[in-house]
UniProtKB/Swiss-Prot annotation:
GO terms for molecular function: proton-transporting ATP synthase activity, rotational mechanism. This is ATP synthase subunit delta. It comes from Rhodococcus opacus (strain B4). The lineage of its organism: Bacteria, Bacillati, Actinomycetota, Actinomycetes, Mycobacteriales. F(1)F(0) ATP synthase produces ATP from ADP in the presence of a proton or sodium gradient. F-type ATPases consist of two structural domains, F(1) containing the extramembraneous catalytic core and F(0) containing the membrane proton channel, linked together by a central stalk and a peripheral stalk. During catalysis, ATP synthesis in the catalytic domain of F(1) is coupled via a rotary mechanism of the central stalk subunits to proton translocation. This protein is part of the stalk that links CF(0) to CF(1). It either transmits conformational changes from CF(0) to CF(1) or is implicated in proton conduction. F-type ATPases have 2 components, F(1) - the catalytic core - and F(0) - the membrane proton channel. F(1) has five subunits: alpha(3), beta(3), gamma(1), delta(1), epsilon(1). F(0) has three main subunits: a(1), b(2) and c(10-14). The alpha and beta chains form an alternating ring which encloses part of the gamma chain. F(1) is attached to F(0) by a central stalk formed by the gamma and epsilon chains, while a peripheral stalk is formed by the delta and b chains. Disulfide bonds: none annotated. The gene is atpH. It is found in: Cell membrane. NCBIfam families: ATP_synt_delta (TIGR01145), PRK13430.1 (NF009967).
Length: 278
């Protein structure tokens, strides 16, 4: 998600509070289903706004009052979404956003957070994070599929349908919902990058650090567990380890956590040796 100015950051904070209130308004037994429904419906709202420029401009027009924009949101979406989702959309419409795109992007983000809450309630957050990471690696390694999913001449619905067919029955419902929404609204992102962003968001929801590891050979379960334990001690919080096999490393590992890179690979040592001999 792109950096927002102060007005939009405050608007997002207020709208997120409305989402929390909406989720808190339902009974405990219905909370998981409500979170999933709100997430899916927020995606549908954004899809409508993407298609209707006049409407999205009106909902973010700061020359009108927040109450006027809330009334417009209720008239347009009141019969299309649940009362809980409508409360979130009205709150968003009532805020003053720096630019219209911040309104839409924030609704997408809150939709994702709501779906991830549903996954967490079902004990599936780890699985969702891993599925989205692996999906990113699969797409990055399949140029034909990546081209199909990023082709701007293909309508968003066509790309969503293609990915949905590929994922059906193979991943959790939350992973499928998140991935298909993202691929239909890539903007300037590559599909693999969009899936990585979703995986990172899932990790953030459980306050985990993501370590992306490239290994010259597959790691055994014992090696993976030791690496995870070591990184957890190093960073002082839970660490999720995502491993890719890269034979070009010759031996060892390259670990990336955020902007920090630990290069313990054979290729890295050779490169350092060559540099020292110059």
């Amino acid at each position: 998600m792109s950096t927002m100015y102060a007005a939009s950051r405050e608007a997002l904070t207020q709208t997120r509070a409305a989402l929390s209130s909406a989720l808190g308004s339902v009974s405990a037994g219905a909370a998981t289903a409500a979170a999933a429904q709100i997430g899916a419906e927020l995606f549908s709202v954004v899809e409508i706004l993407d298609e209707q420029r006049t409407l999205r401009s009106a909902l973010s027009d700061t020359s009108t009052t927040g109450s006027v924009r809330e009334g417009l949101a209720e008239r347009v979406f009141g019969s299309k979404v649940s009362a809980e989702t409508l409360a979130v959309v009205k709150s968003a419409a009532g805020q003053d956003w720096s630019v219209t795109s911040d309104l839409l992007n924030s609704l997408v983000l809150l939709g994702r957070e709501s779906l991830l809450k549903a996954a967490a309630d079902q004990g599936q957050l780890d699985a969702v994070e891993d599925e989205l990471f692996r999906l990113g690696r699969i797409v990055a390694g399949d140029p034909k599929l990546e081209q199909s999913l990023s082709d701007r001449s293909v309508p968003a619905k066509g790309k969503r349908d293609l990915l949905s067919k590929l994922l059906y029955g193979k991943v959790t419902a939350v992973s499928e919902a998140l991935a298909t929404q993202a691929v239909g609204r890539l903007k300037n992102s590559a599909p693999a990058d969009a899936f990585d962003e979703l995986s990172n968001l899932a990790a953030a929801q459980r306050k985990a650090v993501v370590a992306k590891v490239r290994s010259a050979a597959p790691l055994s379960s014992e090696q993976s567990d030791r690496l995870t334990a070591t990184l957890t001690r190093t960073y002082g919080k839970p660490v999720t380890v995502h491993v890719e096999v890269d034979p070009e490393l010759l031996s060892g590992l390259v670990v990336r956590v955020g902007d920090e890179v630990i290069d313990g690979s054979g290729a890295g040592r050779l490169a350092a040796l060559r540099k020292s001999l110059k």
